[in-house]
Every structure is written in structure tokens, then in C-alpha cells.
Amino acid sequence: CDRRFSRSDELTRHIRIHTGQKPFQCRICMRNFSRSDHLTTHIRTHTGEKPFACDICGR
């Protein structure tokens, strides 16, 4: 494709779209992800962790 990037890590992440590569695997359910931050967010579905709270109401 014609996409260009200023950083090599952005290119690496983009290439995964074309190749379908998903190198990050959840150890609990074995689901695979192309990005580590997506895996981190997914793991919270297993742990129930909710690290962000509203400053106004505390929920």
C-alpha cells in the first residue's frame, strides 16, 4: 500500500494489518492480538480490573 511512516514501530504495527500477524496471546483464553495494548485491555475482562475512576462521582 502507499502508507508511509516517520517511525519504524508504526510501520511494524501497520504491516501486521496486511500479514494478519497477532504475536500477543492471552494466557488465559489463548486469544491473539496484533498490539500489546489491546492484550492489556483484554486481560482486564478476565481480572475484573477497572483502573480508571471518575473524579467527580468516584465510579
Swiss-Prot record:
Q: Which UniProt keywords apply?
A: Activator, Biological rhythms, Cytoplasm, DNA-binding, Metal-binding, Nucleus, Repeat, Transcription, Transcription regulation, Zinc, Zinc-finger
Which GO MF terms does the UniProt record name?
Answer: DNA binding; DNA-binding transcription factor activity; DNA-binding transcription factor activity, RNA polymerase II-specific; double-stranded methylated DNA binding; hemi-methylated DNA-binding; histone acetyltransferase binding; promoter-specific chromatin binding; RNA polymerase II cis-regulatory region sequence-specific DNA binding
GO biological process terms held by the UniProt record? cellular response to interleukin-8; circadian regulation of gene expression; interleukin-1-mediated signaling pathway; positive regulation of DNA-templated transcription; positive regulation of transcription by RNA polymerase II; regulation of protein sumoylation; transcription by RNA polymerase II
Site location (Interaction with DNA): R3, R7, R13, R31, R35, R59
**What is the name of this protein?**
Early growth response protein 1
The organism of origin for this protein? Serinus canaria
Q: Which GO terms describe its cellular component?
A: cytoplasm; nucleoplasm; nucleus
Q: Which Pfam families does this one have?
A: zf-C2H2 (PF00096)
Q: What is its main location?
A: nucleus
Function of this protein? Transcriptional regulator. Recognizes and binds to the DNA sequence 5'-GCG(T/G)GGGCG-3'(EGR-site) in the promoter region of target genes. Binds double-stranded target DNA, irrespective of the cytosine methylation status. Regulates the transcription of numerous target genes, and thereby plays an important role in regulating the response to growth factors, DNA damage, and ischemia. Plays a role in the regulation of cell survival, proliferation and cell death. Mediates responses to ischemia and hypoxia; regulates the expression of proteins that are involved in inflammatory processes.
Q: Which family is annotated? A: Belongs to the EGR C2H2-type zinc-finger protein family.
Where are the annotated C2H2-type zinc-finger regions?
1-18, 24-46, 52-59
What Gene3D superfamilies does the record point to? Classic Zinc Finger (3.30.160.60)
